């Protein structure tokens, strides 16, 4: 029983480490996207944002994603593109 608990704790620690790594990757990408948007002229920036939003609207995920997850993705993209971090 102790071995099982120890194995579960090791797996949990690995999952936590993976989650931290993904968080760091997402934050790094946010910084890069924000910097790129800030260095673009306004018209080019707006055109890029519209292209991204249209592409997202046209995507049909496979396998299908539930509506809540799709809405979260759209909200996050809107926040990132329309209101980039300071």
Swiss-Prot record:
One of the protein's GO biological processes: cellular response to starvation
InterPro entries: SigmaS_Anti-adapt_IraP
Location(s) in or outside the cell: Cytoplasm
Keyword terms of this UniProt record: Coiled coil, Cytoplasm, Stress response
Stored Pfam families: Anti-adapt_IraP (PF10796)
Chief place where the protein resides: cytoplasm
GO cellular component, one term: cytoplasm
Domain of life: Bacteria
Coiled-coil features, chain-numbered ranges: 1-38
Function: Inhibits RpoS proteolysis by regulating RssB activity, thereby increasing the stability of the sigma stress factor RpoS especially during phosphate starvation, but also in stationary phase and during nitrogen starvation. Its effect on RpoS stability is due to its interaction with RssB, which probably blocks the interaction of RssB with RpoS, and the consequent delivery of the RssB-RpoS complex to the ClpXP protein degradation pathway.
Subunit note: Interacts with RssB.
Sequence similarity: Belongs to the IraP family.
Protein name: Anti-adapter protein IraP
Organism of origin: Klebsiella pneumoniae subsp. pneumoniae (strain ATCC 700721 / MGH 78578)
């Amino acid at each position: 029983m102790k071995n099982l608990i120890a194995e579960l704790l090791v797996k949990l620690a690995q999952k936590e480490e993976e989650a931290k790594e993904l968080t760091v990757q997402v934050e790094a990408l946010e910084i890069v996207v924000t910097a790129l948007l800030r260095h673009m002229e306004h018209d080019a920036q707006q055109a890029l944002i519209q292209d991204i939003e249209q592409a997202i609207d046209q995507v049909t995920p496979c396998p299908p994603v539930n509506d809540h997850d799709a809405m979260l993705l759209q909200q996050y993209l809107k926040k990132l593109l329309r209101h980039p971090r300071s």
